[in-house]
């Protein structure tokens, strides 16, 4: 069996396009109060400092903005984005389809990411 060439899409058919990888994404969840939340430097600075973590490392808003930018881009509208992979700082990798609709508000985005 022959290995797929780099220009083949994820389903195995030759196709041009782009694959984006968001590396070291800070999408860490923690139990804050009654439920789980995505940690971020604006809402949880005291929690992060209490646990010996640098609040500057917790910026899920950057991931949110990048996903919106990629999925709203002319490249995606032209059908040239094949996939977006998000690799978190906790070594979790997941794929986001180019047809996915990312919530416009950061709060709803965090709510969705907690459910994953």
Label each region the model flagged:
Residues 2-116:
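RNA substrate-binding interface of SAM-dependent RNA methyltransferases
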């Amino acid at each position: 069996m022959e290995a797929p060439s780099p220009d083949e899409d994820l389903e195995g058919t030759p196709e041009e396009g782009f694959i984006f990888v968001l590396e070291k994404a800070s999408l860490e969840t923690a139990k804050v109060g009654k439920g789980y939340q995505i940690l971020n430097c604006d809402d949880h600075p005291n929690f992060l400092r209490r646990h010996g973590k640098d609040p500057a490392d917790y910026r899920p808003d950057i991931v949110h903005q990048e996903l919106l930018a990629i999925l709203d881009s002319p490249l995606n509208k032209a059908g040239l984005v094949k996939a977006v992979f998000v690799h978190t700082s906790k070594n979790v990798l997941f794929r986001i389809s180019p047809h996915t609709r990312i919530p416009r508000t950061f709060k709803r985005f965090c709510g969705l990411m907690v459910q994953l």
